[in-house]
Amino acid sequence: MRKIKRLLFLFICIAVVIVAYEMIQYPIENNAASVQQHLRNWEHKESIDGSARITLQDFKRVDHSNTYIALFSIPGDKEGMAVLKQGWNKRLRIEVSTKMSNLVDYDDIHTNKGTYALFTGTNRSKQIERVKAALVHDTYTIDAAVPKSDYFVLYEKIPSHIKHPFPATTTLLDKAGDDITVKEFMDQELRE
């Protein structure tokens, strides 16, 4: 009887440690307001007052995977993107964040459901209808329709036979299917 009590006590202690560890590792509630607040803290750890005026522009789950993408803007600066992972407690943690270097950025993202092509960007002019990415090391092209919103996050599952989903040559297309990559880039530079 005493051994059973000890084993039960040990089991409870281990369970408490595991739950506490998971809560510490995945502190973000799965909602836009909580993600925005944690991004503010994450992006400006080194700022003097510890605050940031980050505005969350888009927040999406990649298919039915454990991965979420947050697209945010910082006034007077460029946009940024963060990758968040979900723990078994349904809470999130920030894996990585980066400032976007282009009007539309392409990347590959690995999830528990496979590898996805990821487009994050801005479409303030509303001229971008589609975005294409031709993989450099494979003969595969991703073609995605761009929504008529200022900011967007798009993803598409990459077939498992593709070994090198990054890098890719990205092309922005208008309604007529014409390449407007340079035009949109120049227009963005003039707006800034």
Named regions from a protein language model:
Residues M1-F9, V35-L39, D178-E184, E189-E192:
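Short, Lys/Arg-enriched, disordered terminal segments
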Residues K5-Q25:
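Hydrophobic membrane-insertion alpha-helices, especially the h-region
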Residues Y26-T55, R124-A133:
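Short, non-transmembrane alpha-helical segments in secretory-pathway proteins
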Residues S51-Q86, I180:
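Exposed beta-strand-loop-beta-strand "reactive/processing" segments of non-cytosolic proteins
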Residues K85-K99:
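Short beta-strand edge/turn micro-motifs at domain boundaries
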Residues E95-L118:
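Extracellular ectodomain segments of secreted/surface proteins
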Residues Y116-K126:
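Short edge beta-strand/loop segments characteristic of extracellular beta-sandwich folds
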Residues R130-E192:
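Ser/Thr-rich low-complexity repeats and stalk/linker segments
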